[in-house]
């Protein structure tokens, strides 16, 4: 995103496309309230109104035509979202009305906002750190309760506060280390260096451990169902969904291509992938489906390996990579058992036996033990910065005091990258590139 024109007054429609009860045209910048004067007619001019107030009146075109009745909300910088003067013109959510109101605002001197420019200005004004800015986009896109909760925590500054606590431990250690090197006669106690650094490492290790959960909560997870033909993959998919999405027959090889379906499992957005049954076959079409099933399993966040518990156990003909996350499921638990395995979950798609336990196991496998009330790392950018900080702290703990200082300084730089207090422009641009225009 270009940084030119940041002193311009900008405007955009801030509500989603399509018809709605209410629509908003947002204006921000030094001339925002003066421009609102020209587009809004009420008992008082927006420019003569104190911040935090709203006015009722009419939205008007340049020739005086009344476009709609609505509200003008007035915010004065720095006490606004962007830190600048802001006017929000609220109308009925007709696309035609909003287009005319925006056109009038642009006629009066505003320029169209670029994607994410309102939030970029909030970041540059110090109203948000970079992690909070990312949380704005995550909150807009949140499709489940877990995603919403994490985005709200991020927007509240909870992640930044967590990072600042870690940085305070590192800073305290660095200060004690510097004092010991500069004034050895003062006898700085060892615990002044070791205790806070150990605390920083423990807290940062826990934070890094939330990265998988955070990214799964925000972008969702792909869950592949694999097994031999007639292992019950399609039946289990239908049972988890609560409706018939996949065709189920007693004929082996019914599923030859993969099939996807979306659902929310305990607040986590999940894409279920029903795959072809794994077996040696001379049918080229079915063989292609088998190869595809293995590829889908290798790229999935979690694999459910299904085995028919009512038939003699026959392990899969294909090997999955060692790092593949998987849960073993013994299907058809309503039928007499031909074998048992304490490491497998017993499930019946017919009676529903074990489905609740399976859902819980899937949630645990995807989210782990990340504390629900804590802020998580929700982007790869955040996770990378946290891992770098942890690496430098671990290096510092293994080095002599006269060499550890450099590693601690690098750890602080990585933590500053995480919150955006010290980050390069191209990284900031990459964050805001995915925003919609009205944000």
Curated annotation (Swiss-Prot):
Major site of localization recorded for this protein: cytoplasm
Protein residues bound to K(+): 230, 249, 251, 254
Residues noted as binding Mg(2+) in the record, renumbered to the chain: 234, 255
GO molecular function, one term: GTP binding
Domain of life assignment: Bacteria
Enzyme Commission identifier(s): 3.6.-.-
Gene Ontology CC: one annotated term: cytosol
GO biological process: tRNA methylation; tRNA wobble uridine modification
Enzyme class: hydrolase
The protein, known as: tRNA modification GTPase MnmE
